[in-house]
Structure formats: C-alpha cells, structure tokens
Regions:
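Substrate-recognition/cap regions that form aromatic- and gly/pro-loop-enriched pockets
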Residues: 307-432
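C-terminal membrane-anchoring or membrane-association module
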Residues: 515-533
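Short, well-ordered beta-strand elements within core beta-sheets of diverse protein domains
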Residues: 123-129
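Accessory, solvent-exposed terminal regions and/or long lumenal/extracellular loops of proteins
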Residues: 252-314, 318-323
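Core hydrophobic alpha-helical transmembrane segments of single-pass membrane proteins
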Residues: 507-517
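Histidine-centered catalytic/metal-binding microenvironments
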Residues: 408-494
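A contiguous strand-loop segment
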Residues: 6-119, 139-275
C-alpha cells in the first residue's frame, strides 16, 4: 500500500443525533481498481485445512467452521483477497485496514515479518472466525505475537459491546482500546494512540513489550510523564496525513482548535455538535471545502493520482476524497437492531463517493446484486464499480460541463430517501428478530430491489454524462477516456479473459530466455569469465 492510502473514522454513539455508532473508512490505492461486494457463505472446513495469503505466503489453520460474512474484495485473488469490510453472522463488523508504518529505529529492533499477517488476508481470517469484537482483537494479537505482522495496520472491529480500535505497530507489537462512546476520531496513514492504560484489561489489549521495544530502539517518548505510543513508534508526520486528519477533524467539528501545522494530532476528540450519518458521508466526500486549500488532484497528476514531482504548490493538499478511493463504507450500528442482522447497516459506496451513492445493507443478506460481482479489470457497463468510475472520470476531466453539481445532488437526495426507508426497515428487522431466516430474506429482497433500481439510474446518468461530453468535445473524447483506463492495466493479465494461449506464449518466451541465458553463461566461461559472476 502506498503512504497516501485510506482514511478511517469513528464517531461514538453519545455524539450522534440518533444514538448510533458510526465507523467507516475510504479504501484508497489507485484509480481503475475494480472492487466487488459479496456474501461469503458459512463453510465447514476439512480437518487440517489451511488459509494461505497469496500476497505474501502467510498461512493460518482454518477453524472447524468459517462463519458467513459479507466482504468487499479485490478481483485479483492471486495478489491477495483484500476482503476489507463486512459483517459476520454473529453481528461482528470489521474495517481493515488503514495502513501505517513504524519508524526506522523501531523496525530495526522489531522488523515486519515478510510472511506475517497483512491487510490482504486479515479480514478473511478474522471475520469468519470470531463471535465477538474482543475475540477478533485477541485473535489478531495472538497471530502477531506468534507469527508476526507483515506491515503496520489500523483496524476497527465492533459488536454490541462497542468498537475496538487496534494498531498493529511493528513486527510483534500492538495495542488496542475499546473506543470511548463520547469521542470521535479521524485517522489516515499514521499511528495515533497516546497513553495506553495496560492495567485496564477490560478496555485495553496490548503486547507486553510495547514500551521495551521503544526503549531498545531509542525512540521511547513520553507526554505528561507517561509513555506515548504513537510518538514512540511513528516516523515524521507526512503532509498527506496532516491534510487529511486536520480536514477530517474540522469537517466534524468546525470549531475545533486544531491547527494545520500542529506538531501532532490526538486520536480522541469531542464536539458540542450532534453528528449524523450525513456528516459521516460528507467527511468521506471532503475535498477541503471551506478551507484555504485546494485538492491536490486539481494539479497535473501521474498515473497514481499523485502530483508530478516538482510541481507541488503549498495551496494544494491531499484530500480525504481523492482519485485513489476505490470504495467507501460506513457502519451505522444501533443498539436496537439485532446482532443477527449485523447490529446495524453498512452504507456502501462502490467506487469513490464523490459522485456515487451510499446504499444500505444489513449483515444478514444472502446475496448481492450482480453488478457488484463483475470481475473484469477493464471498463464494463455491467459493473457497478466501473460505471461509477466512468461517471467520476467524466466529471473530473470535464468539470466545466458538470459544475452545477447535479449528479452529487441527486445522489444525496436518494440517500436521504433511503435513510427514511432504513428506519422503517430497522423496525422490521427488530420485529423479525425471532425469525432470522425470514429477516434475511426480507433484507436481501430490499437490498436487491434498491440496487437494481439504482444501478439502472446510474446507467442513465453515465449515458447522459457521456453524451454531454461527446456533444462538446466529440466522440473521440470518450475513446481517449477508454484508452486512459486501459493504460492503467496495460501490464496486467486480465484474470477473467486468461486462457491457455497466455500460458503457451509465456512458456515459449521463458524457454527461449532460458536458452539465451545458458548460452551467454557458457560463452562467458569459455572466454575466462569468473565462475561466480
């Protein structure tokens, strides 16, 4: 994962207008990166079955039963599953992960383990294996202790008892807290934990050598006379993290005293405002509105959505809503919604939410709409992700044609309608708590019907936007957009279209290359070359 990837947030239920807990994340990596939304069925595993992460070779024994769960995976499992977010059948929800990294001093003492636990496999291991959020934290802690972590990560995992915020800091060090109900947090790609009270075992889970490793690394730091986790483990704060945490805090609490150039930012914040689901959506769509800064992506960018070197301007900052967002999700967790239904709703925006709607889904759904399951790595009008990607690309490339914001306005109108409908659906799920099968069927039917109607409208919006561009710039402008999208994958093999011709071609090329290498080595030896060259 690049440094500029993913922004998470938590809003405790005592800060919300309706008493729900809000937890979410934008999943950021790169443009033109297809994502799916699926239901993974309960599986009775064979004895001795092993999970292997194709991304790095990490292995873990599968439990006797892998519980049913929803997931938002990548479409290239040979590069890692990246299930990312979902509910399991026991009402545990997870968002994993926000990438982060320890400083060089820490990594020399407790380095990351190449085949350790990584984001690519984390959700696929944890969510189908646990019945409570605490069990999930304890499972991750055990794995990191025994097998190590391949990278630093921040994870949120929740159930009816609350939300756990966990930082996997280095190869074998971690810390987690039960998040306070009267606080909110915004966290991009850096660690934020401060003083951790390890004596409070009900609300804290931490590795025993957390302080020891920092001292050995000579990076141990205190604040107010107490060991400070993030100050001890973090590298210097990156500009892309500063801009997102600052703008995120100000989005939720405009009167917050935080300043852009503060030396560091705390994890926990409070506000006199009563926050709503709309506030959470606005946070994930935030592009530095109301500040003196402008989004970096308004500058000329490279293929990763990053400004070209040497063209950085202090006015331009990296926003939460940026071209690298592949999907965004918000868990709206309510005390009264049964755990069997997930304990709440996951509002999912497939593709960047900048011009895309969030749709609500319970954790007990049995299937997802087909457009969420299209596997291609190239543009397809059958795909939810690619449809949204095309709409966002058109709006970004031709802002003068879409400056009225009509698409975003329509998305927000639909969301507001669904929020009202979802309150009624909550009551239905509560009434069906003793009939879980009927509740699942009801949730699935509602989700499918809404998705089908919405996708049809998104197709109309896409066609209208394409026509608007073609009328102004000609049909060649649309072909240019196709070429730009294809260029992002020109070196990748499309798994959907993969066939044995590729294998044969690769084999012939490999054999030819091997023959050339052998010939050169033999020739070199005959000319007196060193045997160990």
């Amino acid at each position: 994962q690049p440094v500029e990837a993913c922004t998470g947030f938590i809003i405790g239920k005592k800060l919300t207008a309706d008493g729900s807990t809000l937890v979410g994340r934008t999943e950021d990596l790169e443009p033109n990166h297809n994502k799916n939304f699926v239901v993974r069925e309960r599986v009775y595993n064979k004895k001795g079955a092993i999970f292997e992460d194709a991304a790095n070779g990490f292995q873990y024994p599968l439990p006797e039963i892998s519980y049913k769960y929803t997931a938002v995976p990548d479409v290239t499992p040979d590069q890692g599953i990246f299930d990312e977010a979902g509910f399991n059948e026991y009402g545990v929800s997870i968002s994993a992960t926000v990438s982060a990294s320890a400083n060089d001093k820490i990594q020399k003492v407790d380095p990351y383990v190449e085949d350790g636990l990584a984001e690519s496999g984390l959700t696929s291991i944890v969510l189908p294996s646990v019945k409570t959020a605490r069990e999930g934290v304890e499972l991750m802690a055990q794995i990191v202790r025994e097998q190590g972590a391949a990278e630093g990560n921040i994870i949120t995992i929740a159930d009816k008892t609350g939300v756990w915020y966990m930082e996997i800091l280095s190869g074998h060090q971690y810390a987690a807290i039960l998040f306070p109900e009267d606080r909110f947090a915004v966290f991009p790609n850096t660690f934020f934990l401060g003083h951790v009270d390890v004596s409070d075992t009900e609300r804290t889970i931490a590795s025993k050598d957390l302080e020891t490793v920092a001292k050995k690394a000579n990076s141990y730091k205190e604040m107010d006379g107490k060991f400070h986790v993030s100050q001890s483990y973090n590298p210097p704060l990156q500009e892309a993290d500063r801009s997102r945490v600052w703008s995120g805090i100000k989005s939720l609490d405009p009167s917050s005293p935080v300043k852009y150039d503060d030396a560091s930012f705390d994890l926990l914040h409070t506000t006199d405002r009563k926050l709503t689901l709309r506030d959470a959506m606005n946070l994930q769509r935030n592009r530095l509105e109301g500040t003196k800064y402008k989004p970096q992506d308004q500058m000329e960018l490279d293929g990763k959505g990053i400004p070209k070197k040497g063209e950085f301007d202090a006015v331009y900052k990296y926003p939460i809503s940026n071209p690298n967002v592949m999907e965004a999700h918000i868990f709206q967790l309510k005390d009264e919604v049964p755990a069997s239904a997930g304990g709440g709703t996951m509002w999912l925006s497939m593709g960047s939410p900048r011009n895309a709607p969030y749709l609500p889904y319970y954790g007990n759904i049995l299937n997802t709409y087909q457009a969420y399951q299209e596997l291609g790595n190239h543009y397809s009008e059958r795909s939810w992700y690619w449809t949204i990607s095309r709409i966002n690309d058109l709006v970004a490339k031709y802002p003068d044609l879409f400056e009225d914001g009509a698409i975003r306005t329509e998305m927000e109108r639909l969301e507001s309608q669904w929020m009202v409908e979802q309150d009624l659906s909550d009551k239905e799920q509560i009434a069906l708590a003793s009939q879980p099968e009927e509740a699942s069927m009801k949730a699935t039917e509602e989700g499918m019907a809404r998705a089908e109607k919405t996708f049809q409208r998104l197709q109309e919006i896409r066609k209208e936007a394409e026509q608007k561009v073609a009328d102004k710039h000609g049909k060649s402008a649309l072909q240019d957009l196709d070429d730009e999208e294809d260029a992002a994958y020109e070196e990748q093999i499309d798994l959907v279209d993969f066939d044995y011709d590729y294998i044969l071609a690769a084999g012939l090329f490999g054999a030819t290359l091997l023959a050339i290498v052998i010939y050169l080595i033999r020739t070199k030896k005959q000319k007196g070359g060193k045997q160990d060259d």
